[in-house]
């Protein structure tokens, strides 16, 4: 039940390595070629997803202690838990965590449209809730109503409380300081175990890495057309190419670094200016810079195994 319209919710189940994973199915919202499309359509899509997630829980007979929400796309889940789902006994006591990966994207549209899409009353559109100037803001709603708010590092948690990095929400984040934490992104030590990783060219462990690890570097240098030189320092970047990552800080020193015995391997997509920046340095320093403007799970393993340093 999505405000004035009803939409089908399918539930698909997959068990992977002993963990049950549930998928929300709806051809109207999720049948396209890409996960994101028109901004207004995406707002409706993720309002549907948020309601569907909460509606599905009693159907699959799973009552979580905590629902972990990520970015604006799920910002309405903490709001709905305090609104249309608040009276249901099943939902009593469920806590929510709102994780901010990128504060720049907030799910903002005019208030009348968001009221219509989300089915929320005027009560929720005041400056201390979802109202953001004259608009409604999904992420702001998630930050206001979640029990805890996290970001991807302690540093970012502090930065977003300042006007420069706060994207207009710094005041709210300062107000929620006691509930705001930074948690550094982790890695799966089994999947990214160099002793057993099936994607890398030469497996190694802590007992032989000084001898064997460098073979991954020379193999990747050959594969990417870089100068094959085990003594070159290789810096790996596997990332979204956005402002928040600080790539503007290295743009002014790339020329100087590429004159030294340094190589860069970039893997990822993002803002056009950073994609083009790394393409430019690839063109200019083809034996020292490899710009791979896409994402590949296999190649990410190779970069992690080969590089001497990793730039985040």
Question: For each of these PLM feature ranges, what is it?
Answer:
Residues 1-312:
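Catalytic cores of nucleotide-sugar-dependent glycosyltransferases that transfer UDP/GDP/TDP-activated
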């Amino acid at each position: 039940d999505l405000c004035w319209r009803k939409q089908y919710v399918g539930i698909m189940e997959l068990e992977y390595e002993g963990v049950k994973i549930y998928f929300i199915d709806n051809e109207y919202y999720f049948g396209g070629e890409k996960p994101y499309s028109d901004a207004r359509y995406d707002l409706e899509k993720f309002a549907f997803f948020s309601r569907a997630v909460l509606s599905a829980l009693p159907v699959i007979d799973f009552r979580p202690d905590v629902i972990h929400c990520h970015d604006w796309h799920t910002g309405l889940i903490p709001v709905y838990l305090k609104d249309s789902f608040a009276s249901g006994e099943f939902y009593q006591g469920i806590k929510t965590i709102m994780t901010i990966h990128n504060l720049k994207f907030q799910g903002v549209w005019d208030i009348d449209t968001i009221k219509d899409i989300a089915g929320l009353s005027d009560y929720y559109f005041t400056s201390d809730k979802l109202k953001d100037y004259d608009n409604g803001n999904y992420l702001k709603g998630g930050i206001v109503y979640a029990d805890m708010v996290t970001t991807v590092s302690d540093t970012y948690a502090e930065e977003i409380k300042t006007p420069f990095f706060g994207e207009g929400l710094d005041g709210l984040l300062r107000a929620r300081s006691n509930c705001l934490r930074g948690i550094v992104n982790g890695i799966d030590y089994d999947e990214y175990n160099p002793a057993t990783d099936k994607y890398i060219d030469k497996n190694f462990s802590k007992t032989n890495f000084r001898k064997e690890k460098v073979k991954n570097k020379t193999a990747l240098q050959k594969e990417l057309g870089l100068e094959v030189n085990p003594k070159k320092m290789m810096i790996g970047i596997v990332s979204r190419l956005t402002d928040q990552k600080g790539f503007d800080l290295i743009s002014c020193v790339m020329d100087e670094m590429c004159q030294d015995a340094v190589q860069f391997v970039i893997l990822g997509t993002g803002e056009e200016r950073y994609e083009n920046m790394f393409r430019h340095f690839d063109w200019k320093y083809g034996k020292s810079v490899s710009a791979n403007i896409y994402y590949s799970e296999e190649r990410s393993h190779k970069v992690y195994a080969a590089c001497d340093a990793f730039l985040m």
